Curated annotation (Swiss-Prot):
Pfam families: Ribosomal_L31 (PF01197)
Keyword Protein transport assigned: no
InterPro entries for the chain: Ribosomal_bL28/bL31-like_sf (IPR034704), Ribosomal_bL31 (IPR002150), Ribosomal_bL31_A (IPR027491), Ribosomal_bL31_sf (IPR042105)
Self-association state and partner proteins as the record states: Part of the 50S ribosomal subunit.
Family from the record: Belongs to the bacterial ribosomal protein bL31 family. Type A subfamily.
GO molecular function, one term: structural constituent of ribosome
Annotated function: Binds the 23S rRNA.
Stated name of the protein: Large ribosomal subunit protein bL31
One annotated GO biological process: translation
Encoding gene per record: rpmE
Amino acid sequence: MKTGIHPDYHMIKVQMTDGTVFETRSTWGKEGETLALEIDPTSHPAWTGGTRQLDQGGRVAQFNKRFGGLSLKR
């Protein structure tokens, strides 16, 4: 492998939505930082078999924040 072209690969902590924490190696963040998940396999409808959750401040909120003042009326 070439030196100096690859991102730093280090240990981080990942906090699941139920509060459990595990360590893994990643290029995200800095050594020892904690990545807090908003959705994970314990809460995602695809793995739990539940119904789909409504937007929790995600895409729809971003769209409304960005384009909320626009109107199609002339």
